Structures are given as C-alpha cells and as structure tokens.
Amino acid sequence: DNHINQWLEKTDFKSDKQKILCSIRNQVLQDCMSKGSELPPGIYTLTVPTGGGKTTASLGFALRHAIQSKMKRIIYVIPYTSIIDQNAEVFRSILGEKNVLEHHSGILYDLTEDKAENEAAYRKALATENWDMPVIVTTVVQFFESLYANRSSKCRKLHNMANSVIIFD
C-alpha cells in the first residue's frame, strides 16, 4: 500500500480530462485492492478498457492478495517483450528496482560478472535462474518452459512458482 500511495501522490494530473481519467483509474485500483484483500485464492479476471489502469490495478490486487493469502511473490506472464518492458518500468517506478525482475530473451544478466564490481547485476543474474524476487515479469515462453522443460536449468524456477500470485496479461 505504501508504494502505491507514494506513487499516486507523485503523479501529476494536468488537464481536466486527465483528472477524470485518473479518477476512474484510481477507482479501478481501489476496487481491485479491496477485492485482493477479500477474495480467497482462485482464478479471477479483470476486464477494463484500454487505458483504464489495468497494470497498476492488477498490481494492487496482486499485492493485497499476496499479503492476505501469505503468498511469496507475484509473477506477471505477458506475451510480448515490448509490453513486458513497459509494465516492468511501471512496477519499478512503484516498487523500486530491487523488487522487480524482468526476465525475457532480450534481457541477459551475466552470472560470470564480478560480484564485487556490480552487485545489482550479479543479484539479478542469480534471481533470473530461480525467480527469487518479489515481482517477476516474464514471457509466456519463459513461464511454460519452466513448467514443461526437461532440463534442470529451466526447472529451477518451479519451486518459486508455488505459493505465488500468477497474472496472465
């Protein structure tokens, strides 16, 4: 809640049209956060028109639902890397860099890099192998390869998928 409230306070709404749209987005966000606290684990859908604030609303739902259901992480499964880049940037602006892992074919973290030289890159490289971060943003391919692969390197993420809020966008 703190991260989302701070982000809302920093957001500047200039025009009246933006204020109206942002008011609607805020209502969608508040409704999703409320439901995230109330609903038991299950399968849910969120249908909102384009530009209606699904990205932040789904994050609000997921955060509340993870806390209420004592889940360890949130995994976003998205079909296109361009959308992953965009959503991961939004999540980082709200939750901070250290809480969001972006994992797709266009992002490579080097585990051979000197740990002392670049601690953040080394930490992300390790987290990519087993998805050990609070929020993971990944492709459909990465997600299903982790479920169905016959190579241990691909299956290292499997245990961290359990007890997670998983969102298919």
Regions found by a protein language model. Name each.
Residues 1-169:
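N-terminal helicase ATP-binding lobe
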